[in-house]
Regions:
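Active-site clefts of carbohydrate-active enzymes
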Residues: 453-477
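Short glycine/proline- and charge-enriched loop/turn segments
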Residues: 169, 214-222, 334-336, 420-425, ...
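Active-site-proximal helices and loops of the catalytic beta/alpha 8
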Residues: 236, 240-244, 254, 262-273, ...
Length: 618
């Protein structure tokens, strides 16, 4: 809801014209080009956020249009030891409107922020103009959606087992298959629906010689081992009948050497029509191998013959400086079987854009998760969004960008990111316990402020994936730690990301350990984490505030985290207790109803059970 303009001394900037002075000790942050700081609502009103040092006690958005001036008070939405985060939703404003910020220092003096910086006075022309209101069109259905990620070769198998496959449930291998397929996924859709899944995210399904399939041979063919194209069509149709959406995983940065264009380059060299689709440093193609530079995990005696066979190029042993293996063409992280595609080449770019549109248009998928987005030419993603959205305006576009993904989430590229920062936060507080609750709340608040509100609601908040160790393994096998992380995941703003098998308490180290086969026979829906997820997804459906509500951290003790989710007049308190003892929290308000969890509320005092969580309606 937009704020009302208020008469206030800070809003009367007639009195502060003069010679500006630099108040450099005040750290105030606002970037009008970052949607995390300035975004627009559907009615054209502006959502404005500013970060300040905690000592500033009051903040106001000062909007001037012609002779009129309005002051809109910003409210504190989160605090850390380093920053206070202020926010206001105000407007819509006239096209002529210009704005600055005013703050009150502890000594009651005014502090001002304008395009020229932090100052003690405002110059008449030193103001920002509001850009034309434009919505960051994140699909509504993706906001708060429960996303279930699965590794197709290891999730479920349908029919008789091929004798060339490893036995189902055998120790996971980087090179061998266990026979999971898309028909097997269809057979488990009712299970996923019962769990509360809204979106099914599949690791790559296109034809490839590897079980991870990030080295694609044919982008127009679903791997026959998975059942082929019609198996995907059937999966999409059956999932949609259960109101589950499907997003595919695309790796357009690199291909397998058997990809038609690279194969032509390998055979014809500079005469190939596809020569500029790749970045070849030397011709003829070859591999330089430096045995004395190899790490212990890289067994060159095993891998070099494999690479020579797959790529069809010779290798030579050298003893100079350089990486252990160096192809004479650019490849993803130097892996010879993943030559990089030159997406600045118009034809290569056009090919990949056609692929992106094809699966949305012809097979009805609901979006894409794009691999290693950081390493692709940034403007490719502008074209990618335009092409996919032309086919399906509400397609969900998810990027894999480790760390701060802000540059990819300004409304012109992706809708959301795989939120590995969220995972790191959960690992440090819940799995290993090496940070205290106040540090956890600081980082959660910083994460909340990092992106625009639509992006925050759509970010995939994962605690595990195919590229990480499983959370239970990170937690030393202590299931209560996974339980607490799941409670936080299901109550913090965003789209909770479940990695297949975590609901069954699967363990496993990093790749390939985290890619084991689902054990459908010895586990079932009575497993504690499975039941927890079912309960919380059901609660999310009943309580829109847990999905769309504003977030604010309220308190942190050594092991107790308390925050609220508020949507209009509905306010929920979430309490998570990491301690082995019961915890108490004195809440404001006269009424407290326990909606879920272990504990109770009496006379404003809320008690949370040991190593458990609680959701309270206030």
């Amino acid at each position: 809801m937009a704020s009302r303009a208020e008469p206030h001394p800070l809003a009367d900037d007639h009195g502060v014209y003069g010679m500006p002075g630099d108040l450099s000790p005040w750290d105030i942050r606002f970037d009008p080009e970052d949607r995390a700081h300035l975004d627009f609502e559907s009615d054209g009103s502006a959502r404005v956020r500013v970060w300040t040092e905690p000592e500033l006690v009051e903040a106001m958005l000062v909007v001037r249009s012609g002779r009129s001036v309005e002051g809109h008070a910003l409210r504190v939405v989160a605090r850390t030891a380093r920053f206070t985060f202020w926010e206001v939703v105000a407007g819509p404003f006239q096209e002529s409107a210009r704005f600055t910020f005013a703050f009150r220092a502890p000594n009651a003096e005014g502090v001002y922020l304008a395009p020229s910086g932090v100052t003690n006075a405002i110059e008449r022309l030193d103001r920002w103009a509001f850009p034309a209101p434009s919505l960051h069109s994140v699909p509504e259905w993706s906001k708060g959606a429960v996303i279930y990620q699965l590794f197709p070769d290891r999730f479920a198998r349908h029919g008789a087992m091929d004798t060339d496959l490893d036995p189902w449930g055998s120790p996971p291998s980087s090179t061998r298959f266990q026979g999971g397929d898309l028909a097997g996924v269809v057979g488990r859709l009712d299970y996923l629906s019962d769990l509360g899944v809204d979106v099914l995210y599949l690791n790559p399904v296109f034809t490839s010689p590897s079980n991870h399939r990030y080295d694609t041979i044919d982008y127009h063919e679903v791997d026959p081992l998975l059942g082929g194209n019609e198996a995907l069509r059937n999966l999409v149709d059956e999932a949609h009948r259960r109101s589950i959406r499907i997003i595919l995983d695309g790796s357009f940065n690199h291909v397998h050497p058997e990809f038609f264009a690279f194969r032509d380059v390998a055979g014809r060299g500079p005469a190939s029509a596809y020569w500029d689709w790749f970045l070849v440093d030397e011709w003829p193609l070859r591999l330089r191998v430096r045995p004395d530079r190899a790490h212990s995990f890289l067994d060159l005696a095993v891998w070099v013959p494999v690479w020579e066979s797959e790529i069809g190029v010779p290798s030579e042993v050298v003893h100079d400086d350089g990486p252990a293996v160096e192809p004479s063409y650019q490849a993803w992280y130097g892996v010879p079987t993943m030559p990089r595609v030159n997406l600045t080449n118009p034809d290569a770019r056009g090919y990949m854009l056609d692929v992106a549109a094809h699966w949305v248009r012809e097979y009805g998928i609901d979006g894409w998760r794009m691999d290693v987005a950081r390493y692709v030419d940034p403007d490719f993603w502008d074209d990618f969004r335009r092409v996919v959205r032309a086919v399906r305006p509400d397609a969900y576009l998810l990027c894999e960008v480790m760390g701060d993904a802000s540059d990819w989430l300004q409304g012109n590229r992706f809708d959301a990111t795989m939120n590995y920062t969220f995972r790191d936060l959960c690992v440090h507080f819940f799995a290993t316990g090496d940070i205290a609750a106040d540090v956890f709340c600081d980082r959660a608040a910083r994460l909340w402020a990092q992106y625009s509100w639509p992006v925050t609601l759509a970010n995939q908040n994962l605690i595990g994936s195919h590229d990480t160790a499983r959370f239970l393994t990170e937690a030393g096998g202590e299931e209560w730690r996974l339980r607490l992380a799941t409670i936080f995941q299901m109550t913090y703003p965003g789209a909770p990301g479940i990695y297949y098998g975590d609901e069954m308490g699967m363990s496993g180290g990093e790749d390939p350990g985290s890619r084991g086969a689902m054990d459908w026979e010895s586990t079932g829906p009575d497993h504690g984490i499975h039941s927890l997820i079912r309960e919380l997804t059901e609660l999310r459906r009943k309580e829109p505030a847990l999905v769309m509500g504003d977030w604010r951290a309220l308190s942190s003790q050594a092991n107790l985290v308390v925050f609220e989710r508020r949507l209009i007049d509905r306010c929920l308190l979430v309490l998570i207790n990491r301690s082995s003892a019961r915890a108490r929290y004195e809440a404001s308000g006269a009424s407290h109803e326990v909606l879920w969890g272990e504990g109770g509320a009496e006379n404003g005092v809320i008690t949370v059970g040991p190593r458990s969580g609680l959701v309270i309606a206030q």
